[in-house]
């Protein structure tokens, strides 16, 4: 027997979640029906409020969901779907989200590009977890009409496909955000002969060349025309050979901190022209100022003399490796001095072998998000994710929404059915 949700409440509230509810209901009825005596017709009353609390009450076949936004509603609805047994009687769930923006960065640049249907499936999972952002990491895997070789033979998304994904994400209250590259990590784009004139090193653009910024404007225009949001992640990380290739031959040596600031200023001009709200990975700003590795900054560092980004540029602090809260504290102290717009990006640890390293994911996520909460970081995302990282994503979501630690003995070396039972609590 399938479940049928009957939505109740203010019409304006129902309109925000009606389509998404129908999609999740249909998916459940096709794939996840419970055996036994369960409620079929379930009346759901929805209310939205200003606070970040989520409260779900189930009294037999009557459910009340009081929440902040659609993404939180769908998390509550997913809990209801897993607690429909008549024998369970009355039950309730209370949680609070600690970050206004939270979500996943889906890696669509390495090994394979997710199909549109697979991205939609990931969106449904994010909705069930209560996350409200999805970043598509596409180095060269999106269509730029004026650059036919950009992403060719790489499974790039067409503009129509991105728009389709975007519209689907909006159904669940999830903001689809482009995450591209405008400095380094562009090996696949720069391998073509037509791109040689804008190349510094094999994967880095040459700073200061007018052709470089004409190229970047084409990228940003294509992105603006494909995505609903005005937010954009410009990348710019790990450009360790910046200024040491063709730039050095043509212009002589220039400190990387000056080059990154010059490049950011030019790209920001384009963003202002197009009405975009940019952010970048922060490592180049930090390493170019210290002359050391990203995390090698002193305790209580004074950044008053550092070259800093423009006020409107967000900085994304990425940290996939550390389990010590003191490291996160010193790094967030530096970021707070550099920008008022900080985003934290953790990692799902799927890149170290043929299987995800869940233990490392759990340990790092706990340390990172505990510290981000303490420092009131407004936005957090889980990075470099694929479908084999879903348990890590679930861990991330639970730290975002509620204070929960994932005891490894409940997860490691468990059967699929045991894992499902744990995740559906």
Say what each PLM segment does.
Residues 104, 109, 139-141, 179-185, ...:
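Active-site beta-loop-alpha junctions enriched in small/polar residues
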């Amino acid at each position: 027997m399938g479940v049928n949700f009957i939505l109740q409440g203010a019409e304006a509230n129902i309109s925000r979640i009606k389509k998404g509810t129908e999609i999740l209901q249909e998916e459940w009825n096709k794939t996840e029906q419970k055996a036994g005596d369960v409620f079929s017709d379930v009346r759901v009353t929805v209310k939205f409020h200003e606070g970040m609390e989520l409260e779900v009450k189930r009294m037999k076949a009557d459910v009340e969901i009081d929440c902040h936004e659609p993404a939180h509603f769908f998390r509550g609805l997913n809990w209801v779907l897993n607690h429909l047994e008549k024998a369970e009687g009355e039950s309730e769930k209370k949680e609070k989200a600690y970050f206004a923006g939270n979500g996943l960065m889906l890696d669509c640049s390495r090994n394979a590009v997710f199909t549109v249907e697979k991205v939609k499936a990931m969106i449904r999972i994010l909705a069930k977890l209560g996350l409200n952002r999805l970043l598509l990491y596409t180095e060269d895997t999106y269509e730029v009409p004026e650059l036919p070789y950009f992403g060719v033979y790489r499974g790039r998304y067409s503009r129509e496909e991105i728009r389709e994904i975007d519209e689907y994400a909006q159904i669940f209250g999830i903001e689809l955000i482009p995450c591209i590259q405008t400095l380094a990590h562009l090996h696949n784009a720069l391998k073509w002969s037509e791109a040689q004139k804008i190349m510094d090193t094999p994967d880095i653009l040459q700073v200061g060349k007018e052709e470089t910024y004409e190229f970047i404007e084409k990228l940003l225009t294509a992105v603006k025309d494909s995505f609903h949001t005005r937010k954009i992640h410009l990348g710019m990380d790990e450009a360790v050979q910046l200024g040491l290739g063709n730039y050095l031959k043509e212009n002589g040596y220039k400190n990387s901190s000056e080059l990154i600031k010059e490049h950011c200023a030019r790209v920001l001009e384009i963003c202002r022209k197009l009405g975009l709200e940019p952010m970048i990975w922060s490592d180049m700003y930090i390493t170019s100022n210290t002359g050391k590795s990203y995390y090698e900054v002193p305790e209580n560092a004074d950044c008053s003399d550092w070259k800093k980004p423009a006020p409107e540029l967000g900085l994304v602090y990425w940290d996939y490796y550390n389990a010590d809260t003191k490291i996160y504290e010193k790094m967030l102290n530096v970021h707070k001095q550099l920008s008022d717009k900080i985003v934290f990006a953790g990692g799902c640890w799927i890149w170290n072998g043929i299987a995800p390293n869940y233990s490392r994911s759990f340990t790092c996520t706990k340390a990172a998000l505990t510290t981000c909460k303490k420092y009131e970081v407004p936005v957090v995302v889980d990075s470099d994710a694929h479908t084999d990282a879903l348990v890590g994503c679930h861990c991330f979501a639970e730290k975002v929404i509620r204070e929960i630690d994932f005891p490894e003995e409940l997860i490691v070396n468990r059967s699929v059915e045991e894992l499902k039972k744990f995740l559906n609590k």
